[in-house]
Amino acid sequence: MNYKGVIIFGPWCGEFSYELSWWNPGIRKLRNEDFKDYRAVHIGYKGRRAMYKDFIDDYVSYPKEIEDTLSYPAAGGQHIIDVGEVIPENLKEFMYKVAGEYQDKGHEVTLYQADPNAYNGGKHIYDEEPFGDYVNYEVNSEMYDEIKKEVEEYFSDGRDTIALMARIRDRNRGENTGGCYLNWNPDSWEVFLDKVINELDTNIVVINLSTSGAAGGAMSFEGTELYENNKERIMTINFDDDEDSLDRQLALLKATKCSIYGASGSAVLPFFIKTPTFTQQTVEEGFRLRYKWERDLTDDLKNIKIFDKYRSGEDVYNSSPDELFDEFKEFYRSLV
C-alpha cells in the first residue's frame, strides 16, 4: 500500500484505565477518519498492543531503560509533585528518535502527541459518550487455546474457574487505607476468596501484576494462609515482562467462567470482550462504569455486577468480606 505518510501517536505514559477507556478509542477515531491513508504507529508501554491491533500498524514499546523511569502514572501522564501531569523529556526524545527512523526511510512523519492534561477537571471521563470509537476486541485464538489448556491441565477437576484481579496500589492516601483510598484490607480479600473457593466449589486463577511503586498492580496471595490452605485450587499467572501481556489477559478472561476485579478503572477490561465480571467499586467511582459507552460494549451491562456501596478510604478498606461474598454468590449463581 502507498501511504501518504506516517502518523505517530504517543508517547502514552498515563494510567492503564485512562488508556483503555479514553486515549485508545480517541486515537482510533482520529486514525480511521483523519489519517486512514497513513501508516499508523503507537508508542507506549510494553505488553499493551492488543488494544491497538485493529488500527495501528506498528506498535513501539518503550525499552526497559525508559520504562524503568516511569513510576507514577496519573491520568494522562506521569505525576510530578507540585507540578502535575507531564510527559517526561526522555519519552519525547524517544518519540523523536522513532520519527527519525521513519524519516530516514523517506516517509513524511506527523506526530500526534499525548496531552498529559487532557483529562484535568474531569474532561472526557464523565461523558456518557466520549469522543472516540469504542469496539469489542477480538481475542487471539491461539493464546485462548493455550491459556485454556494451561488452566484445565493445572486443575483437571472440572470445577468452574474464576479469574481474579485483586487490585492494590501503594500510595500515601491515608494511614488506615493500606496505601491508597481504593484498597481493600488484604485480610478481607483472604476471607472473601476462601469462601469463593470452598463455599462455591470453584478454582481461582490470579492475575499477578507488580505492585511496586505507585503504578498499582494485583496481589498474588502466594505465601498467605489462603494460598497455603488452598494451593491446589489457586493458580497464579504472572503478566509482567511480556510483550503479549494484554492479549494473554484477554484470553484468560475469555477462558474462565467470570472474573472478579478490585476497585480499579481496569475493571472495564472484561467489558471489551463481553465476558461476565463482578467488581468491587466505591460510591465515588462505581457510577463511572455505567456510562452509555460501557452499556453499548456490554449489551446494557449484561452479566456485569458493580458493587459500590462504600465510600473511598477507610469505609471501603474496612468493609465486610462476608457481605461482598453474598453479593458475588448471587451474581455467580445468576450466570447460565
Predicted segments with their positions:
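A short, glycine/small-residue-rich beta-strand->loop->alpha-helix junction that serves as a flexible
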Residues: 12-22, 170-185
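Nucleotide-sugar donor-binding patch of glycosyltransferase catalytic domains
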Residues: 267-336
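Acidic donor-binding loop of glycosyltransferase active sites
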Residues: 254-260
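Active-site and donor-binding regions of nucleotide-sugar-utilizing enzymes
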Residues: 5-104, 112-114, 248-251, 266-269, ...
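A nucleotide-sugar donor-handling region in carbohydrate enzymes
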Residues: 84-172, 331
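Catalytic donor nucleotide-activated moiety binding site of glycosyltransferases and closely related
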Residues: 45, 159, 164-176, 186-245
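Structural motif
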Residues: 5-8, 161, 258
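Active-site regions of enzymes building and remodeling cell-envelope glycoconjugates
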Residues: 50-71, 77-80, 220-240, 275-277, ...
